[in-house]
């Protein structure tokens, strides 16, 4: 340590890092626009301004709307991974993403991968559900992102069908089996789903992180009751789906889905809300608290005098909160803090829904 103190001086680091943000000569030669905000290049096929908020503008944010007469975009099986939903591999020339790049004068040898073009939502939404290994049972005998548009019954890519539905402002839902969203926590698996116009995913079970990502993008993760599935309900994709009560959706709340079949027969099915998240604070600003509830995030408040600092939390703890499925306004609820060395601490919280 004495040798290090003699040999290593603060001035060495200061001189090395003094121009760290200037870069080398090659970096400084790159031409770039100057300004307070990023100047989007509309001709770039790698980076585009995402369209997540294009339909908002200056409008007041409304309550979450019910899903009325939605069309089914896909009927999927078990263990659909995030790579099935949003592949990161190479882009095929005959895919919707490949067609987009070709129209933008990119040669096929320069298509690169979905992962490398994740900064362009136009590519990524075209790649959603486009994995060649995915099988949509609405189009039996096919592989890849293929579906059957309703009511025309024309077979087309999932992306093209989503665009057709968007023209008529038709909401969409996706049905799946067990373990939907397993694999890596790929954010575009949720982003792409939302951009295609999907309002809800109804599955037999969900992977935790992808389920949370869906909620973050405003897509409702809804779970079949034990023993139910889209296969047992004999869905074929021609049905219309209505789901009421999304504006008041709470963690693990039971909610009803109405299936309108082609011949006019209706089937009512109970689903379970899989929104299970919480924010714990000493106090909440009213509007933000309301927004949290609207997104299915439970706002929970410490008792007077308590705080995470006083509880000496460092982030290594595990948190258990029971009773979120029956949460009422200003209800007292208990949080259990499991610390690294096995000691548990019980803390009372107050529901601020």
Residue ranges and their predicted role:
Residues 1-353:
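Fe-S-dependent hydro-lyases/dehydratases of central metabolism
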């Amino acid at each position: 340590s004495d040798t290090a103190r003699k040999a290593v001086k603060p001035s060495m680091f200061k001189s090395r890092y003094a121009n760290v943000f200037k870069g080398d000569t090659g970096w400084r030669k790159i031409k770039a626009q100057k300004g307070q905000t990023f100047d989007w290049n509309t001709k770039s096929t790698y980076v585009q301004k995402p369209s997540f908020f294009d339909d908002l503008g200056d409008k007041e944010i409304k309550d979450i709307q019910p899903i009325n007469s939605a069309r089914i975009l896909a009927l999927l099986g078990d263990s659909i991974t995030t790579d099935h939903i949003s592949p990161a591999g190479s882009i095929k020339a005959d895919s919707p993403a490949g067609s987009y790049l070709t129209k933008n004068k990119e040669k096929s040898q320069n298509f690169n991968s979905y992962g490398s073009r994740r900064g362009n939502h136009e590519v990524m939404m075209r790649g959603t559900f486009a994995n060649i290994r995915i099988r949509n049972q609405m189009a039996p005998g096919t592989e890849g992102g293929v579906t059957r548009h309703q009511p025309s019954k024309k077979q087309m890519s999932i992306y093209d069908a989503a665009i057709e539905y968007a023209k008529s402002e038709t909401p969409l839902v996706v049905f799946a089996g067990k373990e939907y969203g397993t694999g890596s926590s790929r954010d575009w698996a949720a982003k792409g789903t939302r951009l295609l116009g999907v309002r809800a995913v109804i599955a037999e079970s969900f992977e935790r992180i992808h389920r949370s990502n869906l909620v973050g993008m405003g897509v409702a993760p809804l779970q079949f009751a034990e023993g139910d599935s889209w296969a047992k309900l004999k869905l074929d994709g021609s049905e219309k789906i209505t789901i009421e009560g999304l504006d008041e959706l709470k963690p693990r709340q039971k909610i009803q889905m109405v299936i309108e079949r082609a011949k006019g027969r209706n089937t009512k099915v109970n689903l379970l809300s899989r929104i299970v998240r919480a924010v714990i604070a000493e106090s909440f600003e009213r509007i933000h608290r309301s927004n949290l509830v609207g997104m299915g995030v439970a706002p929970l408040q410490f008792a007077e005098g308590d705080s995470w600092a006083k509880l000496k939390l460092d982030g290594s703890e595990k948190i258990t909160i029971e009773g979120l499925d029956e949460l009422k306004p200003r209800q007292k609820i208990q949080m259990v803090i499991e610390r690294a060395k096995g000691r548990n601490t019980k803390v009372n919280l107050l529901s601020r829904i």
